[in-house]
Curated annotation (Swiss-Prot):
One of its GO terms (molecular function) is RNA nuclease activity. The active site is at R76, H81. The modification O-di-AMP-tyrosine is found at Y83. Modified by cognate antitoxin MJ0128; probably at least 2 successive AMPylation events occur on Tyr-83. Its EC number is 3.1.-.-. It comes from the Archaea. This is Putative RNase MJ0127. InterPro entries: HepT-like (IPR008201), HepT_RNase_toxin (IPR051813). It comes from Methanocaldococcus jannaschii (strain ATCC 43067 / DSM 2661 / JAL-1 / JCM 10045 / NBRC 100440). A motif (RX(4)HXY motif) lies at residues 76-83. It is an enzyme of class 3 (hydrolase).
C-alpha cells in the first residue's frame, strides 16, 4: 500500500481520536452516562478508528507495535456487533486513559512517515 494511502488512514484515526477528546472535554463519567449524543459520537468515532486500522497493512502495523492496533480493531467489532452490550465504564477508560496517549503515538508515526518521504527526495 502506498504511504499516501497509509497516511490517509492515519489522519482519519487521528482526527477521530481528537474528536473524542473534544466531545468529552471537561466531562465527568456521570455526565457522559447521561449524554446519549456524546456516547453515540464517541462510539462512532471508535468504530471509524477501528475500521481505519483494519485497512492498514500488516507490515505497517508490525513496524509500530507501540500502538494497540489489534485492540482498536477488536473494539470496533465489539461496538459494531454490540457483543454483550456496551460497557460505558470501559469506553470511558479508553477515552480518558488510552486515547490521549494514542494521539501522541499516531502523531509521532505521521512525523516519522513524513520524515521518510523528505529523505527520499
Amino acid at each position: 500500500m502506498p504511504k499516501k494511502d497509509v497516511r490517509a488512514f492515519l489522519y482519519d484515526i487521528l482526527e477521530n481520536m481528537k474528536d473524542i477528546i473534544d466531545f468529552t472535554n471537561d466531562m465527568t463519567f456521570d455526565e457522559f452516562l447521561k449524554d446519549k449524543k456524546t456516547q453515540k459520537a464517541v462510539i462512532r468515532s471508535l468504530e471509524v478508528i477501528g475500521e481505519a486500522v483494519k485497512n492498514l497493512p500488516e507490515d505497517f502495523i508490525n513496524k509500530y507495535p507501540q500502538v494497540p492496533w489489534k485492540g482498536m480493531a477488536r473494539l470496533r467489532d465489539k461496538l459494531i456487533h454490540h457483543y454483550f452490550g456496551i460497557n460505558y465504564e470501559i469506553i470511558w477508560d479508553i477515552v480518558i486513559n488510552k486515547v490521549p496517549n494514542d494521539i501522541k503515538e499516531i502523531e509521532e508515526i505521521i512525523k516519522d512517515i513524513e520524515g521518510e518521504d523528505e529523505n527520499s527526495i
